[in-house]
Amino acid sequence: MLSKMRIFLAEDNLGDVFLIEEALRRQSLECEIDHYATAEEAIQAAERCGNAGAPVPDLMLLDYNLPRGNGSDILAVAGRNPKLKAVPKVIVTSFLQADELDHALQLGASCLITKPVDFETLMRDVGAKVAEMLQAGKGSGATSS
């Protein structure tokens, strides 16, 4: 039996958390989601990943605009944690300046998903991208228990 994929989710909007969970269900993905509502919580979790039994995610989904920081702050910390080097990191946001995107990519973001305004597009885009990233990660050794 395959173990559930683990997703590190930094998202302050509970409505978006629900939509992401629904997108994963629609893709028939069995996922364990570790949710962090602020950049500060996510940074602390990223520092702990792989240490003292703290789980290493298969994928990191990061809202860019968060209370107490942003996605780049989380990416910077994740980049310093060797256990997170091979983990795909996806920025999910409704708005991002070009220089912010460039900075996020330099810090290790794999790609950007723009949050659409309508529900069905979000379901399709987020679900498909997460499925793609998780499948790609299976072969790269990023998955760990």
Please provide the spans of the model-predicted regions:
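Alpha4 helix (beta4-alpha4-beta5 surface) of REC/receiver domains from two-component response regulators
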Residues: E22, D73, L96-I113
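Conserved acidic segment of CheY-like receiver
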Residues: M5-D16, I20-L24
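Active-site residues of response regulator receiver
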Residues: L62-D63
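Short amphipathic alpha-helix used as the core "switch/output" element in two-component signaling
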Residues: S72-K85
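Acidic catalytic/metal-coordinating carboxylates
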Residues: T38, N70-D73
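Acidic, metal-coordinating helix/loop segments flanking the phosphotransfer/catalytic sites
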Residues: H35-L59
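C-terminal output helix
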Residues: V117-G127
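Hydrophobic/aromatic residues positioned on beta-strands within the core alpha/beta folds
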Residues: V92-T93
